[in-house]
């Protein structure tokens, strides 16, 4: 299966850049940083190249969201560490970056009968309540992802830890629908 069958929409990753941060110092030094501990315990900071957003916590942990690929996550976290160092905040060398979640989209290029899919996939693996939500929610054990299936043939894959997890999730759906004669 070609890598182009999915489009990564969002990568969420976390790391620990320091033992602790003084978020008021970072807020005062980083243009556009937002910190209001009465509303949220972390500082929010957005960057534009590559586009991503950070949640920075006093514990030294950083969550990066909004990146479109794993390489961009590494780039923006590296840039964040350099920026922190430039204002006198020492960061850890080579921090371990953990991808928490990847959201991807795909298109099967066909109209789908979600009622038939719900019956075919078995009610123990799916949630389908069209009055509540127009998509069918399909939980896959291997890879451990959730695939939202829409009657338009569009899919949203969430919960992947790698782009390959998302690719495999789409392939599982494609094979199962094909086996049921629903593609």
From Swiss-Prot:
Pfam families: TBP. Sequence repeats lie at residues 8-84, 99-177. PROSITE patterns: TFIID (PS00351). The keyword Protein transport does not apply. Keywords: DNA-binding, Repeat, Transcription, Transcription regulation. InterPro entries: TBP, TBP_archaea, TBP_CS, TBP_dom_sf. One of its GO terms (molecular function) is DNA-binding transcription factor activity. Gene3D superfamilies: TATA-Binding Protein. It comes from the Archaea. GO terms for biological process: DNA-templated transcription initiation. General factor that plays a role in the activation of archaeal genes transcribed by RNA polymerase. Binds specifically to the TATA box promoter element which lies close to the position of transcription initiation. Belongs to the TBP family. NCBIfam families: PRK00394.1-2, PRK00394.2-1, PRK00394.2-2, PRK00394.2-4. This is TATA-box-binding protein 1. It comes from Methanosarcina acetivorans (strain ATCC 35395 / DSM 2834 / JCM 12185 / C2A).
